[in-house]
Amino acid sequence: LDFWTRELGLNISALKRAAADRIAVRPGAEAFLAALADGPKRVIMVTNAHRDALDLKLERTGIDRYFDALVSSHDYGHAKEAQAFWRQLSHSHPFDPARALLVDDSLPVLHSGRLFGLGHLASIRQPDSSLPAREHTDPFPAIDDFLRVLP
């Protein structure tokens, strides 16, 4: 966000707000998050979204109530694709990587999580609801319906 605002001389945050009506929770995702939040495990959102973009998404969806913590890669200065992100996350929010679950729509992020030692990894079959679903997310299983993976 900051980079493109500087590079293009445009208020990218304002442009994102103008398109905010396109922000929505995936079908079944809220029930999935509620079930996780009701369980004994900590639930942490990790995102590459800039804090301004994340705030807008949370304002529109209200899903922040399901998380114990919200971490933007911008907080650490490293994208989730970098091992430095996972090291910083494990220092800020100690967890056992082998027991952690990461659900992400980015295959490079999932590969990075696997390299860090995250034990449970799942992809999103259709990262962009306006585009067709992916045929392959190998080697990661793909979620196409959150209601089918309720804990």
Which residue ranges define each predicted feature?
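A metal-dependent, Asp-based hydrolase signature
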Residues: 1-17
